[in-house]
Amino acid sequence: MATKIYPKLFMKNTAEDYLQAAIDTAEWIDTLVIKTEHGRIWTALPDGQDGYREDVPLFTPKSMYDGSAGIGIFLIRLYEATGNQRWLDEAEEAAAHIIATQVGVEWYDKTLHSEVKGIIPVPGWAAGSYNGPVGEAYFLEDLYQVTGKQEYRDFVLRTADVLLEAAVRDEKGYHWSDQEDITADGGFIVFLDILYRKTGIQKYLDAACEAADVIAKDALDSPHGGKFWKLLDLSMIDFEKETTFPNWSHGTTGTAWMFAALYKDTKKQEYLDLAKAGLEYAMNIAVGDENGRLIPYQDHPVTGPTYDKYYLSTCHGPVGSTLAFRELYDLTGEEIYKKWTIELSRGIVKAGAPEKHSWGFWNCQCQCCGTAGILEHFAAMYEYTGEKEFYDYMIRTADVMLSDSDHRTPGQRTWYDSWWRTIPTRIVSYVGLYVGVAGCASSLLRTYAVMKGKKLTNLYEYHFFE
């Protein structure tokens, strides 16, 4: 018996294991690089894989969701974690291509006012921050903060000015699209507010408030108490008419988060009242107790909340919705919001994650819908609370994330998953930040940073907590 052999399989993962996994992922991503005359982009996924690209309005080459802007944010984090100039150089190459191919107001005119084809035909999402120029601006603002190079801030300001030019004023008010969720117009408002905080330029806050006032008028009284929003017509994507999302990316808690952020900069009481009313609604339809709570996936005026369906990550789950609760606690000091931030976070684990899959937590690893988003959240929750409970959840999730990866090629690592919940057999390896392996590795970097006491660039959703 080889008693002196102690295999690595018996050993616990260390912070260095998480860091090395992120480095190996960056090496894999670089196998898909496309050098351009201006810099670099990446192909969305390896040749021969049956994944999405232009048929989804979030999967475009420069997007923050799946393209070079998001990968660039991951590379900034990798540079911050390692100090290796290579990763910053690659991020700047991605930025150079984005700057050289910057679009104007005509891009919004075309995207918002022509037919959006594909499987998600929603104009506001096609133009929104995860897919369009605003996501590119988030990346370049992050680069500006790291390098101090004025060309990056100049790009951000041009992007914001084009966004203002693209807005319309009509009988509805000041807006861009017919979709008001934070993946569409609400996300533009958040961007303008963040930019105001960073620059102090008043016109950006003024525009954010004017657009937010349109959404404020659309608040609806809920029979459960509080207020909710019907932010878009979900029959566009084959849901029953009048269906609404209660959670973050396309729903009420995301809108509450937006209003809470605006209240911090304006002290306009209506914004605080709307944020509180939105979370009152969410709390009133939630299930669970102090050991774990969840907010249902959908609501409908006839059939009510979907008490058999729950997401667990960012888009429709606690990871996203807790952003609003945490923001309101920071603004008001009212303990109920911190309490719910903690209890919704516990709901993720009570539902079986990260080990157990369920209806709204399937074989998906990404920041948007899956394990990476949960890991990012638990790292943030440990920093926020200092509680060992969330440190342990973070390590559990990081270990599951690492174990689900493919590292058969020495020095490279990737993940395979199903981004589209209703097509579980479509297993591919996307490169992007919110849909793919850059997001997986980025959340491992976040874990490494917490363990080592390092500060990394935040994903945009966490900028308000800086």
Predicted regions and their residues:
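Glycan-recognition and catalytic cores of secretory/periplasmic carbohydrate-active enzymes
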Residues: M1-E466
